A protein has these predicted regions:
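Short Cys/His-rich metal-coordination motifs, predominantly Zn2+-binding knuckles/fingers
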Residues: 1, 32-33
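Histidine-centered nuclease catalytic patch
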Residues: 1-26, 39-46, 50-56
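Sequence-level detector for tyrosine residue identity
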Residues: 10-11, 16, 24, 48, ...
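The −1 position to Zn-ligating cysteines in a subset of zinc-ribbon hairpins
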Residues: 29
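Domain-level detector of nuclease and nuclease-like folds
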Residues: 35-96
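C-terminal, charged low-complexity interaction regions
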Residues: 76-170
């Protein structure tokens, strides 16, 4: 097993010295997020906590009300926003602390690709692929759009699934 990312102490090692050497206290974090988190006492959720259930959902929003090209994947004239309906206080802390909306707006190209795939892989084409490869429809969607049920297992999994669900044909 090889891990190339940074690990962060969930419980501050200077305040909780016994937790400094505990492997269960280490959570994956990008270098920038690790530095940001170390400067605050705001409570965020531990992704390994058995009760972890982030309510954060991503969606797109018109940047220019007259431009609907983005709905077909033809432009990046949209914003990526976080639907804050029913979120927990710890979710809101994460959104604010890590400036998530600003960060995810740098992924418009990824969202645009998902929008195009959602249009290209219509119901008929997905049915064809399911038959050709003898694969379940849910599994096929996971392969096409790059997400897993356990979002912590794959980068951008939550983001990819949320954007896909916004644009897929049923």
């Amino acid at each position: 097993l090889q891990f190339r990312g940074d690990l962060d102490h969930y419980y501050n090692k200077s305040q909780y010295t016994a937790m400094a050497i505990c492997l269960y206290n280490l959570i994956p974090a990008c270098k920038v997020c690790n530095q940001i988190k170390s400067k605050t006492d705001k409570k965020i959720q531990n992704p390994y906590d058995s009760s972890y259930s982030s309510k954060i959902r991503f969606k797109t929003e018109f940047d220019d009300q007259g431009d609907i090209d983005y709905l077909q994947g033809k432009s990046q004239n949209f914003n990526i926003v976080i639907d804050k309906t029913n979120i927990l206080e710890t979710d809101n802390n994460e959104i604010d602390l890590f400036e998530l909306e600003n960060r995810y707006n740098n992924l418009k190209r990824n969202a645009q690709e998902i929008i195009i795939k959602a249009k290209a892989y219509d119901v008929q084409y997905k049915k064809f692929l399911e038959d050709q490869f003898d694969i379940d429809g849910d599994e096929l969607e996971k392969y096409i759009f790059g997400y897993t049920d356990e979002h912590i297992d794959r980068e951008l999994s939550r983001f990819n699934k949320d954007i896909m669900e916004e644009f897929k044909e049923n």
